[in-house]
Amino acid sequence: MGFATILYSIWVVLSSFVILSAYQLEVRKFLVKLLSKIVIGASESNVASFFAFVSEKSLEAASVKFVATIIAERMGAQFSSFYDKIFFVDMLGLGSLFALAAVNVLAARKLESELPASLEPSIGNRDQQKNSSLAKCFSRLFINDLHGTTVKRYPYISYLPNWLLAKNNAERLVYKSHLLLNAYSPPKSASASSVIVWVCGAKKSESIIIPYLSSLGFFVVVPNYAQPPKFPLSDAVEFVSLCVDWIVENAIYYDADPERIFFLGEDTGASVALESLKHIRPNSVKGIFALCPRSIQNLVWTNQSTIPMMTLHAGDVNPVSDSNDRESSEKASLIKNFVVPGAVPYYYEFTSPRTISTATFIARWFFLVEDNKKTI
């Protein structure tokens, strides 16, 4: 009976701290550092991913807590004189988890009723439904080795701040967008890694460029955001901006430097990345590379940032000065709609932007920006 009470008490204390960490950033930081030292083989990033899982999956966490309470009673903990007090604290935590789950559902219902028809996504995206499964979410607790011992991938990590957890889950139910990110961590080095935020294009597939850049020493973050034209540009910009907030808050867990964040946008993602610069803290992004950018209708550039920018287009001819043929004329029109102060367009003839040669060009540009060897 005494042993069962001790175990139950330890469980209640630990689970209460975990629940509290979903709302208090300082508590989570303390637990991440503590558990990474106590649990053998667990890194700070693994522990941080675990807390993200508990925060997002409140109903599953509540179920585990409920089962643990039943096990404690079966072991005889209820016969202890301290059981009532411990049980009361346990029920406070259980109630908090159920309340968070209820808020998520109610908020989603309210959000869905207010949502304009134009924002409603197509129903039945089975790939996204699979990503929301419990087993899929558990997979982010472990490191997936992509390329031997060079690049480590941390999948399905939440990038929304803790104070938006309820809104996160509510919008996930309505928008069918998971608001998660994949992170690629390079081999450990003496200094913290620079961060590249890869804002993907319409096809939403991850390029070979991503692990390649990571193998060169960059910490690459790929947000799963609401992409235009299926979603409004404002939603995409909001999600990418929140991703930057996540990096600033969590970079320490991945040996990355939150003061050295770069944007790499492809296709429509380049437009989203550029537009995001107007909505994030000034100078939080140190440079931006636009890969084959695609113009978004009715998007008016008002960005006045002086950060280094590079635009990479397909073709070896400057379409602005040589617009005799139809193809060059179309490119010239694109450039006209894609004028960004500080951007330097570069025309590189290639069959596909997703190649190692293109990645080498991109990496070289980022290294030049970091070393201040070239004014862009």
Swiss-Prot record:
GO molecular function terms listed in the Swiss-Prot or TrEMBL record: hydrolase activity
GO CC entries: endoplasmic reticulum; endoplasmic reticulum membrane
Subcellular location: Endoplasmic reticulum membrane
Main location: endoplasmic reticulum
Entries under Pfam families matching the protein: Abhydrolase_3
Its job: Has a role in meiotic chromosome segregation.
The protein's name: Uncharacterized protein C8F11.08c
